[in-house]
């Protein structure tokens, strides 16, 4: 009886197909219709300039440092530019996308001499959780206090968005005034703050 050598069959061989890569989420766009990039700076402006200006930094609640993320009340002011980068290991794709974890930091110098990266505060100041800059005071086990997302503003046909803090869970970010009617702070509150992104000049 003749022997049969392995691999000599004329039958075609079939290999499992590699898993298909999920489609990337849609990109975020600036006011000129260009995709947001991790190597560029942007102003975060109110979609309705009658509701105030861009995001900036301000002291609050009796603290000089760290600085709180706040909104300039003057609709003609752009605030400070920010740099938005993917959370975790930087991918080769430099496009900032919807529903994807990002880190946000101001591209500005302060008298506090510390990081200007955003994070959600674990403490309640005036009964709310604020977005502040600087190092995280009491990090959670997950360490995701500095994780944020950009989501499309519901029903918007233009490039309008909302910001979310996405630590252990995601929360909409809105603007509210302090108890003394002073600064306008960014924090976990409703209604959420509707924003647009305007490209800033290179630093």
From Swiss-Prot:
Residues 15-26 have a biased composition (Pro residues). Gene3D superfamilies: 2.80.10.50. Pfam families: Kunitz_legume (PF00197). CDD domains: beta-trefoil_STI_ASI (cd23373). Residues 1-22 form the signal peptide. Disulfide bonds join 65-112, 166-170. The record marks 89-90 as: Reactive bond. Residues 1-12 have a biased composition (Polar residues). InterPro entries: Kunitz_inhibitor_STI-like_sf, Prot_inh_Kunz-lg. Keywords: Alpha-amylase inhibitor, Disulfide bond, Protease inhibitor, Serine protease inhibitor, Signal. PANTHER family: KUNITZ TRYPSIN INHIBITOR 2, KUNITZ TRYPSIN INHIBITOR 5. Belongs to the protease inhibitor I3 (leguminous Kunitz-type inhibitor) family. This protein inhibits independently subtilisin and alpha-amylase. This is Alpha-amylase/subtilisin inhibitor. It comes from Hordeum vulgare (Barley). The lineage of its organism: Eukaryota, Viridiplantae, Streptophyta, Embryophyta, Tracheophyta.
């Amino acid at each position: 009886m003749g022997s049969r050598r392995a691999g000599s069959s004329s039958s075609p061989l079939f290999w499992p197909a590699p898993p298909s890569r999920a489609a990337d989420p849609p990109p975020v766009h600036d006011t000129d219709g260009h995709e947001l990039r991790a190597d560029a700076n942007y102003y975060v402006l109110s979609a309705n300039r009658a509701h105030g200006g861009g995001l900036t930094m301000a002291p609050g609640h009796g603290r000089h440092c760290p600085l709180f993320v706040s909104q300039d009340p003057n609709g003609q002011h752009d605030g400070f530019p920010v740099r938005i980068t993917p959370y975790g290991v930087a991918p080769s794709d430099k496009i900032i996308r919807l529903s994807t974890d990002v880190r946000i930091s101001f591209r500005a110098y302060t008298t506090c001499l510390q990081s200007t990266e955003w994070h959600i505060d674990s403490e309640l100041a005036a009964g709310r959780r604020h977005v502040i800059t600087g190092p995280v005071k009491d990090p959670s086990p997950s360490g995701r206090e500095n994780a944020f997302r950009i989501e499309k503003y519901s029903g918007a046909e233009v490039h309008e968005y909302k910001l979310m803090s996405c630590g252990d869970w995601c929360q909409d970010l809105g603007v509210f005034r302090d108890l003394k009617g002073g600064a306008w702070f960014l924090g976990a509150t409703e209604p959420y703050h509707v924003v647009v992104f305007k490209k800033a000049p290179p630093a």
